[in-house]
Amino acid sequence: MFACKNCGGNVKFDIKSGQLACEYCHSLFDPYAYEDKTSDAEVQKDFDATIFTCPQCGGEILSTDDTAAGFCSFCGASTVLYSRMQKEHKPAYIIPFAKTKDDCKQAYMSLMKKAIFAPKELKDPKFIDGFRGIYMPYWTYYVTQKAPISLPAKRSHRSGDYIITDHYRLEGDLDAYYKGLSYDASSSFDDNISEKLAPYDVKNMKRFTPAFLSGFYADTADLPSTIYASDAMDAACTNTVSEISKEPAFTGLSVDSDSAALSPLSLGTTVKETDYSMFPVWFLSYRNKDRVAYATVNGQTGKVVADLPISVGKFLLGSLIAAIPVYILLCLLTVLTPGMTLTIVGVLAIIANICYSQELTMIAVKEAGTEDKGRIAKEQPEALGAINNRRRLKAAKKATKTIKKKTNTSFIAYFILFIFVIQFVPALFAIIAGIGGSFGNADGSLILFVILTIISFIFSIRAFSSFDRMPGHKGVAGLIFGMVSMLIGDAVLLFQPVLDAWYYGAAFIIIASVLITLINVIRAFNVLTTRKLPQFATHKGGDDRA
């Protein structure tokens, strides 16, 4: 804790002034005025810090203050954190907070205005006031590239019935320097969040002194700098190829992403220096039973990255409202016979199953943590080689995309898509529903519906294989009900009852299964936008009173 030099009161870092401000007499002080003045020539490599530990998840956070922390930002637990004093490794640089808590809350609310299906709790002013300022640890890499290069490139064009591809060699002497390629140095900070929060402007880094932490908390590095060294070199290669492609003479050329010429070795890529730094993040956690969602704001730029779950009730209500005009258009385009109605709901069932199966596949990838290199480095270090290869291939493909002139067509594209959905999707349903009639008899409708049933079963079986990743294995009963409902539709078309009530009854059962599947899709989406409650042996959590 730092004391005011005038009145002895507590001083904290004031974001607006960039100085330490006294809470009582409002005096301002340079943060470097509180540095230890030692007679030793050697610069101190450690500083005194209070380590707070969450009793529920084992998360740890450090502070220069000794006031008891009462909230863990990483697991969302409202509890008094245990504390102890210890020496911490001193970072070389720090980017002080530039965005105040009010700036952070305004940026978050701007995002929430667009999130119409988000739970109301996420928009509660009391909840939003829970943002905490945390300095997250980063490794900052300084990368050089110096080598003669020869990149294979090609350009294709059509001539009559032929596609002609011209091959080129882009040759020259490369001399590039990248300053401040940064990656989070904490296994507790999800790589997906840190990558989306980027970039930070390293030009505004300042030499670290503990006084900058006054009034805030900080996570500490538990990953060695070697973990992300290959990523820094790959990022340098990606940017270099992108810059080369932007040269006017090379416009329209694409570089072979599988070429060995794009490797860090071929481009003479070397990490010359690495610094341990701290970057500012406003952090908020939302806990729902055994899952937690995070909202983060870049403390320098104000960029917001948030996990936004969906309220089941809001989404179903919105879907119902959106379905009404589509149903009206469908009725205007064709006469809905009982057989057509049954076929249409069968198509809807397939679409729902495809969405659900895809969500479960994505959950399997996320829960395995294979996209979070920091987590894998702590839990499965033997898998790092495969992850590095996958990330390198992804970076190479990103670098070799053909450079095209940017045009302001996004609004036009969305408008065209909207017109397509409104005008043609109902017609498409009508065409699909009428295919059975084109066979000339009821057997055609049965054949079509059997095909729909088989497709639905394929995606249902695929979904079954991923259920072990779903919390509580929820959704199994709904999936079975969906399969049974499709078989009921097959039975109705097979026996061809005289009463229309049989067809509409089967259609109603299938619609009910679609509704259940839709709810399961939302639940699966919420699993994707939340995370398992963290449990760490030595983990970093967070709390802040700024």
Report each predicted region and the residues it spans.
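Charged, low-complexity helical/coil segments in non-catalytic cytosolic or luminal regions
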Residues: 89-287, 313, 335-346, 354-414, ...
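Residues immediately within or flanking Cys/His clusters that coordinate Zn2+
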Residues: 1, 17-19, 47-51, 69
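Short Cys/His-rich micro-motifs in 6-15 aa windows
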Residues: 26-33, 75-83
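Short cysteine/histidine-rich zinc-coordinating motifs and their immediately flanking basic loops
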Residues: 16-21, 34-39, 65-71, 84-90
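Alpha-helical transmembrane segments of integral membrane proteins
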Residues: 397-546
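Extended, hydrophilic extramembrane loops/domains of integral membrane proteins
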Residues: 279-313
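Short functional micro-motifs and their immediate structural scaffolds
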Residues: 10-12, 30, 62, 80
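Short cysteine-rich clusters marking metal-coordination/redox-active sites
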Residues: 4-7, 22-25, 54-57, 72-75
